[in-house]
Amino acid sequence: MNRALLRAAWSSGTALRAPPSVSRAAVYRSAIHPVNRSFASVSCLQSEQPSSSSSAVPPALEPKDELTGNSTSESTPHIPWYLQEEAPLAESEQTFSRDQIPELPTNPPAILPALLDYVFKDIGLDALKLIDLRGLETPPALGANVIMIIGTARSVKHLNVSADRLCRWLRSTYKLSPYADGLLGRNELKIKLRRKARRARLASRSGTMFDEKDDGITTGWICVNAGVVEETPVKKDESYSFEGFGHTATGTRVVVQIFTEEKRAEVDLESLWQKALDRSEREKQRLSQVNPGAPSEEVRASNSINVSPSDREFGHASRFPTSPLFGQKRLLHTDHRPISQKFDRAAIHAEDTEEALGSQSSSLLRDHDHSDNEKKLRSMDALFDHLSNLSDVQARIELGEGPEDHDSTLFLRLFHDVLSVSSAEEKAIARLVLFCNAISRQHPGYTKRGLYAAFTECTCAGYLVSDDLAFSVVSALLSPRLAGTSSEDVAGQVPEADQELALLVLEHLSLRGTNVVNMRVFDMIYRAVAISPSTTAPDGANDAQTGNKSSLYRVTRLIDTLDLPFEPEQARSLMLSLFQHGDYDDFWKLWRKGPLNGSLRTAADYKMLFRLHADLGDELRARDCVSTWIPMMRREDNPIPLEGELLVDIKRCLMLADPDIVQKAAEGSTSNLARFWNACQMKMLR
């Protein structure tokens, strides 16, 4: 039974030599059943020499007995490692891990401490660094007022998992809408990694090299933009000294940049932003030395358009003195300026101008008490107001022979008298307004090429051309020409060269941030297309008419596709153009769109509606119009009264719908048209 153990014991030479004082049975018993000992901290080689009085103890068993006694008397009971309690760390060692969380900046948002703890403790990002970019013009892709956190993930999988968990935590805890650039979904990442492993196995089996080029799984960099985490509590006063587009950002944004270790060393994002911060600090110091009393200004505006759910070219761009297209010196603005410009030095001759104009029978100026600031405006504004009140023929006479004519008419003499005391910017703007009026009135002495040159002169010099004035330039360029102004012109049409000039102006407006996708612009385009010669249709009147209808159809389809914002005044003008060119379906579509967009119909809308049908002369359309929309006038949120010009237009439509309406009403007819006629008659008698 214990044969193997006995064989091992008897094979030893020392075991065979038993001391004479020990019996053979004792030797067998110790060899077969060895003495059990507990572990001791004393080395097994350490033993004490036996005393002379212990000669009765066998030499072979004496060290074992002594070691056992020492272990029980001198050492504590052994505790396994998995039951041992760890000694408490020193306070310095406890705070060492907390030192990896960066310090909070001044005026941090409330979410920032919790976000740093979550990123460091729960997600496990290393080497965290916080960069406060709220004093910089950050790229629009990040948004304004950014606090950036940079961290390192341990692997590609950790990178994706960290970004995914961070987005879910921001959504569930703070109800934010973060987006992560470069993040793959959980299932998508698993599928791509599985496919990559399969390709590697197939390559190893076939003995070919596996191409480890960029497979689109990850770039080693994920940018988590949490968006606006805190709105600015104090609302700042708006400044109108700059121009541009979009809205001024007021909230603080937090962006978390997560890298793998290799990608972070390659990009070195901290150094790039630190250089930008250093440049900004040097610029502030330079400005403070030039003008110590002037406060530092920060202009930070975001894109978007329409924007995006989160704000969506690039970098801290210096403001060039010229625009990309015309070399325009420009600032940023958030509000429109009026068309009229302030002619400060023109106030010197304001009273003389009024006396000269007051002697005319047309009475160019009205006698009102004006303040000093208004006097600076009224001399030039009064001239253009007087011009706008004249008919086209009279206006062309007042404008003289052309831009080189300075004194042939009283209007030109007064105009150039005001220009003589104006600044260079005021002169350029005034000439541009003069060209717009002349081209719109189809004056043969003023060319559209000259109008475009005047506009280019203003933009290249960096003068402030308001959006309204720029749109007036586009409208003038798209207006029809008179016959005979040049050899290739056709009466009542807009040549392709004029259309190209208008598109250049629209392109400039778009580049400087003006919204050109609106009903006002499409109304001008629609009118120009309707009177433009067809370049795609073959010869012949019918073919040309078919080509124009096709072009108009494309414009209306584009309007429907873009779903333009509804502006009542612009929509009324566009509806007028649609109806006048026979596009009745799109007219009614736009007519019904107003209340759906929260725009109530007014008396001006109904006046336009009934006047258009009365001028059209279509009996069926007139009958449908009065039968449907006269009752609707009383059902509007603000009921439309039957009075004034509206009443006259309704009576015209009624007479067109039923030529015998007067006789039927006198005979006591009870038809709807007769009742409408009687109601109109009663309103007129009151």
UniProtKB/Swiss-Prot annotation:
GO CC terms of this entry: mitochondrial inner membrane
One family name in Pfam for this protein? RsfS
Q: What is its main location?
A: mitochondrion
Start and end residues of each stretch annotated as Disordered = 48-77, 280-319, 352-372
- Lineage, top-rank taxon, reads Eukaryota
Q: Please provide the Gene Ontology terms (biological process) for this protein.
A: mitochondrial gene expression; mRNA stabilization
Q: Which of UniProt's keywords are assigned here?
A: Membrane, Mitochondrion, Mitochondrion inner membrane, Transit peptide
Q: Topology in the membrane?
A: Peripheral membrane protein
Localization of this protein? Mitochondrion inner membrane
Locations of Low complexity compositional bias?
48-59
* InterPro entries with a match to the protein in the record: Atp25, NT_sf
Q: Where is the transit peptide, renumbered to this chain?
A: 1-39
Q: What does this protein do?
A: Probable mitochondrial mRNA stabilization factor.
Family stated for the protein in its record: Belongs to the ATP25 family.
Q: What name goes with this protein?
A: ATPase synthesis protein 25, mitochondrial
> Which organism encodes this protein?
Aspergillus niger (strain ATCC MYA-4892 / CBS 513.88 / FGSC A1513)
What taxonomic ancestry is recorded? Eukaryota, Fungi, Dikarya, Ascomycota, Pezizomycotina
